[in-house]
């Protein structure tokens, strides 16, 4: 067996094995702040053609949930249905009970970035109009944002539960979201810009693809970004970590 054949045998099915059991793959790239304005201008992305969201996370000042692999989040979406999400990662797909697939808000997917592939399971449920604002104002408890199904989901997937009495509100993040197409990219592109109250920004560009297209999509999307001159953020922070660490720092400082 020659060298090329050995190399091919070693890598054959490598991506497919990493993604076994998930329904879809989202390939994400973080754009550094000094490239954000150029990206917005290139695709004419403005606050007039976006989907605007306000995102709140719920965790302890020490980010105990996040450290344990759990995320509790609520989104106020301008002009659309508000919702809340519980997510657990990483997961082993074949250990996730199939009974959760009956829920429209269930997702079993993988996120791919320069740092690797992470599989997650999440359950999103609608929330009542105005409920998020009431919780943030302290008029309702955080627990009111999450359903019994979401509680059962975390217990089933992560063998854990959330003590809402120990959680604080982290946020809001103001988010702008766009979907658009580029002739050079065969996949529909999503851009999301998050803004913190201190003025810091983080932009993520992503595509979603069926698992069967994963290997081609990963290589193709990275090649597309290089071709259009989109510089990747070498830190490759996830939006969630970037937001949580900032607001958790603020909480800890208030307690000093």
Where are these regions (language model features)?
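Phosphate-end processing signature that detects enzymes handling 5′-triphosphorylated RNA
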Residues: 2-256
């Amino acid at each position: 067996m020659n060298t090329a054949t050995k190399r091919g045998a070693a890598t054959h099915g490598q991506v497919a094995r990493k993604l076994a059991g998930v329904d879809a793959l989202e390939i994400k790239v973080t754009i550094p702040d000094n490239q954000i304005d150029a990206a917005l201008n290139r695709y004419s992305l403005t606050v007039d053609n976006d989907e605007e969201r306000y995102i709140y996370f719920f965790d302890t000042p020490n980010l105990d949930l996040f450290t344990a692999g759990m995320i509790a989040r609520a989104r106020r979406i301008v002009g659309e249905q508000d919702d809340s999400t519980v997510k657990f990662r990483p997961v082993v797909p074949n250990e996730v009970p199939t009974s959760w697939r009956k829920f429209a808000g269930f997702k079993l997917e993988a996120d791919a970035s320069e740092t690797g592939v992470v599989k997650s399971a999440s359950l999103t449920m609608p929330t009542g109009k105005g409920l998020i604002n009431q919780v943030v104002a302290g008029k309702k408890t955080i627990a009111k944002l999450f359903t019994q199904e979401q509680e059962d989901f975390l217990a089933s997937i992560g063998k854990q539960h959330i003590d809402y009495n120990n959680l604080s509100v982290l946020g809001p993040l103001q988010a702008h979201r766009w979907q658009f197409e580029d002739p050079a990219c065969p996949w529909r592109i999503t851009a999301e810009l998050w803004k913190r109250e201190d003025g810091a920004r983080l932009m993520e560009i992503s595509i979603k693809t069926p698992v069967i297209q994963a290997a081609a999509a990963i290589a193709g999307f990275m090649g597309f970004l290089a071709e259009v001159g989109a510089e990747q953020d070498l830190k490759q922070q996830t939006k969630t970590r970037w937001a949580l660490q900032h607001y958790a720092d603020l909480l800890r400082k208030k307690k000093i």
